From Swiss-Prot:
GO terms for molecular function: ATP binding; magnesium ion binding; succinate-CoA ligase (ADP-forming) activity; succinate-CoA ligase (GDP-forming) activity. Its EC number is 6.2.1.5. GO terms for biological process: succinyl-CoA metabolic process; tricarboxylic acid cycle. Pathway: Carbohydrate metabolism; tricarboxylic acid cycle; succinate from succinyl-CoA (ligase route): step 1/1. It comes from Bdellovibrio bacteriovorus (strain ATCC 15356 / DSM 50701 / NCIMB 9529 / HD100). It is an enzyme of class 6 (ligase). Substrate binds at N264, G321, I322, M323. This is Succinate--CoA ligase [ADP-forming] subunit beta. Keywords: ATP-binding, Ligase, Magnesium, Metal-binding, Nucleotide-binding, Tricarboxylic acid cycle. Binds 1 Mg(2+) ion per subunit.
Length: 387
């Protein structure tokens, strides 16, 4: 689950991470009032969407007067902001964050994340803050430094100091950086983050170490432990079909292709997406029905897939372990009848009760194309949508 920048800063402040004064606004009038309350003579108007790269897209503006605060807010509210993370369709800006300006001397990058290679948390930092870290990794990988964190003791002060020196921080601010890094790590662990990213962390000309922008993503499996975090969820920033899928415990991610996929198991689902692309087509979604799906769940999955007007065909790929093939077949038949399915449907079944499942599909009288294996399934659905 993602949250907005202003919410991430609220969370981080609780753990001692220093931020600038800021206030949320939904209109030019609120923005001006916020700027007056914050004080000073320079403010930053920031569009609040669940995506990075806002500055390049025109979603971050420095205002040097209250009139400019009003002007920039008026332009941002309601605009469709397109960044490298939103895709070409962009996201509509519904609110802005008015933040105090500061005298930036140097920008850095720092993040806590899970290192899949070690199975531990890690802290990454770079002297090249304010840039997309993916670009830094590609063009100057040596600029990124990393420390692995032992979960039994957490981030040790010597590790934080070492990281600060590795990215070129001045000795005079290292102690402040150590406190900052510790707060970031503590927030990461306490709230069950999958990533907590500060980009940029800035050192001001006055020698302060501050969080200028923040991104936090939380493990959705842990949200039952964090009702305060759940309250921060902004459904307006999420794909409606993904919200609907979550109500039925379906793991669903909308994609840009035209072949709908219904699969059990995340690994098999990813392999299914890959083989569709291998055969020259594009998947419309990732959908894992899980191991305990029933007829009703399969029907809801079909409904969600078919709400996407780009879907020209559906591939069902099931390996029956806990999930029995006859249960899937029953769900496929029920969904096809209830929805009056008009797009090609290819079904590949393997595993528990596979023969019974295939028999049910064959005797259903519906236009369902069986497939013997994954390659056969991909070839058949691609051929079907291409006519």
């Amino acid at each position: 689950m993602n949250i907005h920048e202003y919410q991430a800063k609220e969370v981080l402040r609780k753990f001692g991470v220093a931020t600038l004064k800021g206030k949320l606004a939904h209109s030019p009038e609120e923005a001006v009032a916020a700027a007056k309350e914050i004080g000073g003579s320079v403010w930053v108007v920031k569009a609040q969407i669940h995506a990075g790269g806002r500055g390049k897209g025109g979603g971050v503006k420095v205002a040097k007067s209250l009139d400019e605060v009003s002007e920039f807010t008026k332009k941002m509210i309601g605009m469709t902001l397109v960044t490298h993370q939103t895709g070409p369709e962009g996201k509509v800006v519904q609110k802005v964050f008015i933040e105090q300006g500061c005298n930036i001397a140097k920008e850095y990058y720092v993040a806590c994340l899970i290192d899949r290679a070690t199975g531990r948390a890690a802290m990454m930092a770079s002297s090249e803050g304010g840039m997309d870290i993916e670009e830094v990794a590609e063009h100057n990988p040596d600029a990124i430094k990393k420390v692995d964190i032992d979960p039994t003791v957490g981030l040790m002060p010597f590790q934080a100091r070492e990281l600060a020196f590795q990215i070129g921080m001045e000795p005079a601010i290292v102690n402040k950086a150590v406190k900052f890094f510790a707060g970031l790590y503590n927030a990461f662990v306490a709230t069950d983050c999958s990533i907590a990213e500060i980009n940029p962390l800035v050192v001001t000309k006055e020698g302060d170490v501050l969080c200028l922008d923040a991104k936090m993503n939380f493990d959705s499996n842990s949200l039952f432990r964090h009702p305060d975090i759940v309250e921060m969820r902004d459904l307006n920033e999420e794909e409606p079909s993904e919200i609907e899928a979550s109500k039925f415990d379906l793991a669903f991610i909308k994609l840009d292709g035209n072949i709908g996929c219904l699969v059990n198991g995340a690994g098999l689902a990813m392999a299914t997406l890959d083989i569709i692309k291998l055969h020259g087509a594009e998947p419309a979604n990732f959908l894992d029905v899980g191991g305990g799906a029933n007829k009703e769940k399969v029907t809801e999955a079909f409904k969600i897939i078919l709400k996407d007007k780009n879907v020209k065909g559906i591939l069902v790929n099931i390996f029956g372990g806990i999930m029995k093939c006859d249960i899937i077949a029953e769900g496929v038949i029920a969904a096809s009848k209830e929805l009056g399915l008009k797009v090609p449907l290819v079904v590949r079944l393997e595993g528990t009760n596979v023969e019974l499942g295939k028999k049910m599909l064959k005797e259903s009288g519906l236009n369902i194309t069986p497939a013997d294996n994954l390659t056969d399934a991909a070839k058949k659905i691609v051929a079907a949508i291409k006519g």
